[in-house]
Amino acid sequence: MASPSSLCLLAALALISWQAMASDPSPLQDFCVADMHSPVRVNGFACLNPMEVNADHFFKAAKLDTPRKTNKVGSNVTLINVMQIPGLNTLGISIARIDYAPLGQNPPHTHPRATEILTVLEGTLYVGFVTSNPNNTLFSKVLNKGDVFVFPQGLIHFQFNPNPHQPAVAIAALSSQNPGAITIANAVFGSKPPISDEVLAKAFQVEKGTIDWLQAQFWENNHY
């Protein structure tokens, strides 16, 4: 029969192994440039042959200093992730420029795979995130040029330009090569196929006609 100390050691090893498997692995080589054409399906991308790698795999002429035209909610997101720079594969980071029209917003959304840190380059932004159930606490702040704010991974967050006359610009860094995004309104009212209006009417405590009207709108994909 195993001794108590042996059982404790086995339990500790099992816990350590479980924690190791539950987090993203660190790179095991200098780089693993994504091979976009590989038939191998892995969590991320297979590595391109290092002998075929060149500097362009780590470069993108993105012109992130150039203003972008905003959409009907008054924002435009220019994302640079592993799909634009294959060299980001396994490195756990991406970047985005967000342009905001006067009174424009980046609507409430989440990044299921990344924490975000946002820096205001120009203008003013009202930003915030909401904690999970049951408290649903709002943490919000008005940011000015040079200010920085963090949005924890997976939590609903937003940015809004309160200035009716001046645009705003921000840069966001995200802790994933592919952070993903779920824009709340798009997901709930613009899903394909649509969620039953009976389900949504009860969830939001409104008439079915209100839900039908919302689902009939054009839910533009503006996310990163």
UniProtKB/Swiss-Prot annotation:
Main localization category? secreted
InterPro entries cross-referenced by the UniProt entry:
Cupin_1, Germin, Germin_Mn-BS, RmlC-like_jellyroll, RmlC_Cupin_sf
Q: Does the keyword GTP-binding apply?
A: no
One short Pfam name that applies is: Cupin_1
Query: Which residues are modified by glycosylation?
Result: N76, N135
Report one GO cellular component. Answer: apoplast
GO MF term set: manganese ion binding
- Residues in the signal sequence: 1-22
Please give the function described in this protein's UniProt entry. Plays a role in broad-spectrum disease resistance. Probably has no oxalate oxidase activity even if the active site is conserved.
| Subunit comment | Oligomer (believed to be a pentamer but probably hexamer).
Q: What is this protein called?
A: Germin-like protein 8-5
